[in-house]
Amino acid sequence: MFKRAVLGYLVLRLLTALSFLVFAGSASAQTCPLNGTLSNKLVCQIPQVYGAFGFGTATDPTQSVLYTGDHHSAHFSSGFLSSFAPINEAVGIQASQLPIASPSSGITFVYDPVLKTFAPSTDESLGPIVGNRATTIGKHRLFLGFSYQYFNFGSIDGQNTSNIPAVLQHQAFPVPNPQHIPSCDNQTALTTANGYAGAPCFVRDFIQTSNNIDLTIHQYTIYATYGITNRLDFSVAIPILNVQMAVTSQATIVPNSVVPAAVGAPGNVWHSFNLTNPVLASQCASQNPCLNATFSDSGSATGIGDVVLRGKYTVYNGERFAVAAGVDVRLPTGDELNFLGSGATGVQPFGVISYKARISPHAEVGYEWNGDSTLAGTNIVPAPAGTTPTNTGKLPNRFVYIVGADIRVVKRLTAAFDIYGQRLFNSPELVSQPYMGLGHCAGPTDPTGATCGTYTAGTTHPDIAQITTDYNITEASLGLKYRLMGRLVITGNVLLKLDEGGLRSNAVPLVGISYNF
């Protein structure tokens, strides 16, 4: 008993010290400047998919993605930021708060009056996989576990991650201006409300994009639980993540205005992709003007995630029915800019009820309060003109519930089923919001480019927008536990998506192994 107590104490001290050590050394917030400097942080993969300047203008014209002749420099930067920032924020927030298996479910010990000691229970199941039971593992008992989960995200808020549409609108353009480009003579659809009143004809141009975000996460988690008393457990869960992300964007410039021939722009359009950019040279070789291009970026990161500390106390422990209360504390030990962590402390009080039998039902409810994180701020990328960026913002709070049962199929085998649900509050969500074009102008044009000529009304194009709302994330957990030998238990489980909220995989497989000392 003394050796087991010392072992448990040393293991928990080591794991807890490690978690605080990583917390103390976590990375400070950085941004994706889009000023020619590339960042290797995964949070910058989406903003940098078009290169180090995005759709901005580089000092060296050959580094600009868009053609920047003497007549007019391209102005799509703010449109780019406003269209893609919601995707980046949603991916960052939701990929950094992944579910983990229960840190202390396994073999339970009951007092044997004949042996006058605690012995493994033979008439109970091996416990839940995602949920918890109200009983503890016993005084000076130690539970060690390891699990692996694989996340292959296929949708975000119901949007297929292989085809996320986004329209990049032209910025408002003042008149008068240094280029002496006059207002469009046909101001239809150019209004004060949308910021285009008095603008030149070329603000009708836009860029339609279709975007594929390939995001996978391998999660390896180490668990330890130690019984302080017969009613009080302390647990620590340390996840180690490998995050792989690849972004591909197919972009098409839609020219809705004609540049005067005297200006000499490629194809007599105001906006086109830059033929002199080395990245675009091969794609644009057969196009004049170059209006279609594909861009890509990829990266990966490996490191410790957010460490979770748990204390659980059994308030009532009857012959079969038990009630417990506890608290989870999530430490921001993972690098949020690489989607390894949330960047914020989270505190979740919870309550558990469970019943001990061959079929053992259990239920858990909790509410998590989250702090501020860089991921929820507006300073990841340069802020659009006229806005004030914030370094951090509040991560959404959430209500969590788990309801299910574990069934002792045979002496060594347990089947577990749970409904795992979350309700996120004041959380960013992507929604489909079609873009209404500003119409099309066709020649003839005069030398100033102010004449619209023949005007055709605009049509709708697929686009996304960000709203702040409350939504649900619901999953079903199906799994098996098998006692391989003695106190060694192996686990297999799968989480199945039941609704469309959040960043989701259709199925999340889990394998694990644990041992009770």
Where do the PLM segments sit?
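Repeated loop/turn-to-beta-strand initiation elements of outer-membrane beta-barrel proteins
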Residues: F153, L232-V236, G318-A322, I359-A363, ...
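Outer-membrane beta-barrel translocator domains and adjoining extracellular loop/strand segments
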Residues: I156-T161, V247-I253, A325-D328, D335-G343, ...
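Outer membrane beta-barrel transmembrane domains
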Residues: T161-H180, C184, V263-Q287, N292-A293, ...
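Outer-membrane beta-barrel biogenesis signature
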Residues: A29-A193, S432-P434, G449-T454, I467
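Residues on the lipid-exposed face of transmembrane beta-strands in outer-membrane beta-barrel proteins
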Residues: L126, V130-R133, L144-Y148, I222-I228, ...
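Transmembrane beta-strands of outer-membrane beta-barrel pores
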Residues: Y148-G154, I238-Q244, D306, V315, ...
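Extracellular loop and loop/strand-boundary signature of outer-membrane beta-barrel proteins
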Residues: I129-G131, F206-S210, A293-S298, G334-F339, ...
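Residues that define the transmembrane beta-barrel architecture of outer-membrane proteins
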Residues: L126, G138-H140, T216-Y220, T302-V307, ...
